[in-house]
């Protein structure tokens, strides 16, 4: 179900996602499709893929932020780390990774670059010396005020109103949570594994 007053999903809610996918993807099974409502009748076309639309939009956001962040010599992933730390300092690498959906192999180099540029510092936790906590430096804290306009600026580039952006954010968060909850238990039939 789409939040924010949108239309209900044309796909049935199925307690066992695997059974639902097999039933929906069965040869000759009629199914109501979002694609046919928008003129995209081929469910295997790239333009009909919700996953690709989200992927492409994420890349477009990255490009939009890249030019704005270049003035501060930051990358978009580094900016995301700073957003987390502006909310709460002293988090472990694992806690930051959990919030950003990044593994330590991806996050550790980002933190090293932020540390080398003077935006963050690492500190060993006194009770457990193996645990490293990440804190902002004065330079890192000072960037927050300089970047307050970024979300509004990039949001304005979308061509959507603030209310539309908030509704989309709610829908995407709901979709993300559902996918995380179901991803491990879904078994796709080999012939229809495109989504």
Curated annotation (Swiss-Prot):
Report the SMART domains cross-referenced here. Answer: HTH_MARR (SM00347)
The knockout outcome noted for this protein's gene is: Disruption of the gene confers the ability to use formaldehyde as a sole source of carbon and energy. It also confers formaldehyde resistance during the consumption of alternative carbon sources. Mutants are defective in the transition to methylotrophy.
| HTH marR-type domain mapped to chain residues | 47-177
One Pfam entry name: Staph_reg_Sar_Rot
Check the record and name the InterPro entries matching this protein.
Answer: HTH_MarR-typ, MarR/SlyA-like, Transc_reg_Sar_Rot_HTH, WH-like_DNA-bd_sf, WH_DNA-bd_sf
Q: Name one GO cellular component term.
A: cytoplasm
Per UniProt, which keywords does this protein have? Cytoplasm, DNA-binding, Stress response, Transcription, Transcription regulation
Q: Which domain of life is it from?
A: Bacteria
Gene Ontology BP terms: response to stress
Q: Which residues cross the membrane?
A: none
Query: From the UniProt annotation, which stretches of this protein bind DNA?
Result: 93-116
Q: Where does this protein chiefly localize? A: cytoplasm
Q: Which GO terms describe its molecular function?
A: DNA binding; DNA-binding transcription factor activity
Q: Mind telling me which PROSITE patterns this protein's record contains?
A: HTH_MARR_2
What compartments host this protein? Cytoplasm
Function recorded in the entry: Formaldehyde-responsive transcription factor that modulates resistance to stress induced by formaldehyde. Impacts the expression of a number of genes encoding transcription factors and/or involved in stress response, including efgA, and which probably collectively trigger a formaldehyde-specific physiological response. Required for optimal transition to methylotrophy. Not involved in a general stress response.
Something else the entry says is: Can modulate formaldehyde resistance independently of the formaldehyde-sensing protein EfgA.
Q: Which PANTHER family match?
A: ORGANIC HYDROPEROXIDE RESISTANCE TRANSCRIPTIONAL REGULATOR, TRANSCRIPTIONAL REGULATOR, MARR FAMILY
What protein does this entry describe? HTH-type transcriptional regulator TtmR
């Amino acid at each position: 179900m789409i939040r924010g007053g949108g239309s209900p999903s044309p796909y049935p809610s199925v307690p066992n996602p695997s059974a639902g996918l097999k039933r929906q993807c069965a040869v000759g099974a009629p199914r109501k499709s979002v694609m046919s409502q928008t003129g995209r009748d081929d469910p295997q076309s790239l333009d009909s893929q919700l996953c690709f639309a989200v992927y492409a939009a994420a890349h477009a956001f990255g490009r939009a932020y890249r030019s704005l962040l270049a003035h501060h010599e930051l990358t978009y992933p580094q900016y995301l780390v700073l957003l987390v730390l502006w909310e709460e300092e002293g988090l472990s690498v694992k806690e930051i990774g959990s919030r950003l959906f990044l593994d330590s192999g991806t996050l550790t180099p980002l933190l090293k670059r932020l540390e080398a540029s003077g935006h963050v510092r690492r500190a060993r936790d006194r009770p457990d010396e193996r645990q490293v906590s990440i804190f902002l430096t004065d330079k890192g804290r000072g960037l927050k005020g300089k970047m307050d306009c970024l979300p509004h600026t990039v949001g304005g580039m979308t061509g959507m109103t603030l209310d539309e952006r908030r509704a989309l954010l709610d829908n995407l968060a709901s979709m993300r949570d559902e996918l995380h909850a179901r991803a491990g238990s879904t078994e796709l039939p080999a012939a229809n594994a495109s989504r």
